[in-house]
Design a protein with these regions (language model features):
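C-terminal catalytic/substrate-binding lobe primarily of soluble NAD(P)-dependent oxidoreductases
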Residues: 1-201
């Protein structure tokens, strides 16, 4: 915010938002890696935030596991061996790929922008709604994997077709977004847009 990193306690800022086709969900302010490159590449941005939704049951389970030490990354002695609790927990949990057939509902992933264009205040919301079961029917995975894989494929397509072509290492926001967004539209992640979204305080 205003050119400075702001640190807060984990999960301490919660907002409720009414997501198109998904409904009212609690979302939490947290760090995500794209914030870092956006802050570097768009220094005139006054504030960049990332919110993600979590259900109360998920949070309760995470707190319980944290309270008993199962989320620790520090090795502990167990029956004469050193184990890392969170790695042990991972070994007990189901393979995420096995959850595809049982995952139901939809994702809503988007960005809300506010700013000025030609001296006029503007607000713009671009988002995608993706159905878990439709994704599973198409590719055998749920929408979380789908909404991760399709943009990566579209980015590769931009490089292979020469639409994105600069020597060096760059992040997505450093290229022309239009052909990338068009590729997303064509390959299963069509966008929706709103000029009057509800803003998040």
């Amino acid at each position: 915010e205003d050119g400075h990193w702001v640190e807060i306690s984990p999960m301490s800022i919660k907002r409720e938002y009414d997501f198109d086709q998904v409904g009212h969900k609690d979302m939490y302010l947290l760090h995500h890696e794209e914030i870092e490159s956006l802050a570097l590449n768009i220094p005139e941005a006054r504030r960049i935030r990332f919110f993600m939704t979590f259900g109360q049951s998920y949070l309760d389970h995470m707190r319980c596991l944290e309270n008993v030490g199962m989320l620790s990354t520090s090795p502990v002695d167990f029956e004469g061996r050193q184990i890392v609790p969170i790695k042990f927990l991972k070994a007990l949990l189901p393979d995420p790929a096995s959850l595809g057939p049982r995952t139901k509902g939809k994702t809503n992933i988007g960005c809300i922008f506010t700013g000025k264009k030609a001296g006029q205040d503007k607000t713009y919301y671009i988002y995608n709604v993706c159905d878990h079961q439709e994704c599973y029917r198409e590719v055998g995975s749920q929408a979380i994997s789908y909404t991760t894989g399709v943009p990566a494929m579209c980015g590769a397509l931009m490089l292979l077709t020469g639409k994105w072509n600069k020597p060096g290492v760059y992040t997505v926001e450093e290229f022309d977004p239009d052909p990338f967004l068009e590729a997303l539209d064509q390959h299963g992640l069509p966008r929706s847009e709103s000029r009057t979204p509800v803003l998040v305080d």
